[in-house]
Structure formats: structure tokens, C-alpha cells
Amino acid sequence: NLNQFSNMIQCANTRSXLXFANYGCYCGY
């Protein structure tokens, strides 16, 4: 899902790169 991927990038930028590296992180979704 492209929209979900976009949210993952925003999550990564907001919290840390670690959230993006660990694709299974919750990130509020």
C-alpha cells in the first residue's frame, strides 16, 4: 500500500530512522 508506505516515511522522520528500518514497528498505525 503506497499510502501506508508514505505514513511509514513520515513516522521514520518524526520518530527515528529505526522505525523505518524495522518495518514491523507500530508507528501509531
UniProtKB/Swiss-Prot annotation:
Name what cofactor the protein needs.
Ca(2+)
What the record notes about the co-factor is: Binds 1 Ca(2+) ion.
Gene Ontology cellular component list? extracellular region
Q: Which reaction does it catalyse?
A: a 1,2-diacyl-sn-glycero-3-phosphocholine + H2O = a 1-acyl-sn-glycero-3-phosphocholine + a fatty acid + H(+)
Tissue/organ expression:
Expressed by the venom gland.
The organism's place on the tree of life at top rank: Eukaryota
* Annotated residues for binding of Ca(2+): 26, 28
Protein location: Secreted
Listed GO MF terms: calcium ion binding; phospholipase A2 activity
Cited SUPFAM superfamilies? Phospholipase A2, PLA2
Keyword line: Calcium, Disulfide bond, Hydrolase, Lipid degradation, Lipid metabolism, Metal-binding, Secreted
| Post-translational modification remark | Contains seven disulfide bonds.
Signal sequence coordinates: none
What are the EC numbers?
3.1.1.4
Task: Name the top EC class.
Answer: hydrolase
The protein's predominant localisation is: secreted
InterPro entries, alphabetically?
Answer: PLipase_A2, PLipase_A2_dom_sf
Q: Which GO terms describe its biological process?
A: arachidonate secretion; lipid catabolic process; phospholipid metabolic process
In the UniProt record, does the keyword Iron-sulfur occur? no
Role according to the record:
PLA2 catalyzes the calcium-dependent hydrolysis of the 2-acyl groups in 3-sn-phosphoglycerides.
Family of the protein in this entry: Belongs to the phospholipase A2 family. Group I subfamily.
Report the protein name in the record.
Phospholipase A2 D6
